[in-house]
Amino acid sequence: MAQTMLLTSGVTAGHFLRNKSPLAQPKVHHLFLSGNSPVALPSRRQSFVPLALFKPKTKAAPKKVEKPKSKVEDGIFGTSGGIGFTKANELFVGRVAMIGFAASLLGEALTGKGILAQLNLETGIPIYEAEPLLLFFILFTLLGAIGALGDRGKFVDDPPTGLEKAVIPPGKNVRSALGLKEQGPLFGFTKANELFVGRLAQLGIAFSLIGEIITGKGALAQLNIETGIPIQDIEPLVLLNVAFFFFAAINPGNGKFITDDGEES
């Protein structure tokens, strides 16, 4: 009898466990497990990645603005690219010519002799022995005066001052008190103007030398021959001309020189 009851209870318990749904089985097993058991059921974790609906627009890289190179200005015979004679070189030659022409006029006013005669007085070399050098000097001066040696680059004037600099505050210095600019050149004499005056001085030296070779007289004496005016009557004009050439030679004009390679000086 006791054995029959045990068998019946075992069959009933087994039948009950077989009819249970599989979802409930982990819970039954969990009831039989102790709380200190290290066995744990795996849990699912869902991770969410945030997505931006509006993304910032990527900025395009700024375009490089290439500065236009200064155009090479060829000389009359297209020699500017060959020997590299720039306007800065021509400006230097023009300054030397202005000093030389002013000194020759001053020397002729004092001694009454032209450039070649003054050179003979200083060196003692006869003119006929220096004829090749003299002809080369005349040719070089003429070619430089007409820009035949080349004129690479260009002169750029300084930018004009703004309206706020037009009114000069009082009490700065003497130039401000006279209504003149505090900084920069006193007069508006640019490097382009200085280049033009230098070319005129080169032409003056060249033609005065040619005239002295032909007539044997200096520049002032040639002027007397052409106009018939005595030198004594035009002394103030001669002195003014000499002073102007000296001042133009030593006065640094405003502006800057830009070559065809973009270099500034």
UniProtKB/Swiss-Prot annotation:
The chain crosses the membrane at residues 96-116, 130-150, 195-215, 229-249. Disruption phenotype: Normal green leaves under continuous-light conditions. Non-photochemical quenching (NPQ) phenotype. Accumulation of purple-colored anthocyanins leading to dark leaves after a prolonged exposure to fluctuating light. The double mutant missing DLDG1 and PsbS/NPQ4 (dldg1 npq4) has a pale-green phenotype similar to the dldlg1 simple mutant in continuous light, and an identically reduced NPQ induction as in the npq4 single mutant. It is a multi-pass membrane protein. GO terms for molecular function: chlorophyll binding; mRNA binding; protein domain specific binding; xanthophyll binding. The keyword Cytoplasm does not apply. Residues 1-59 form a transit peptide. Pfam families: Chloroa_b-bind. One of its GO terms (cellular component) is chloroplast thylakoid. InterPro entries: Chloroa_b-bind. Sequence repeats lie at residues 54-158, 159-264. Belongs to the ELIP/psbS family. This is Photosystem II 22 kDa protein, chloroplastic. The gene is PSBS.
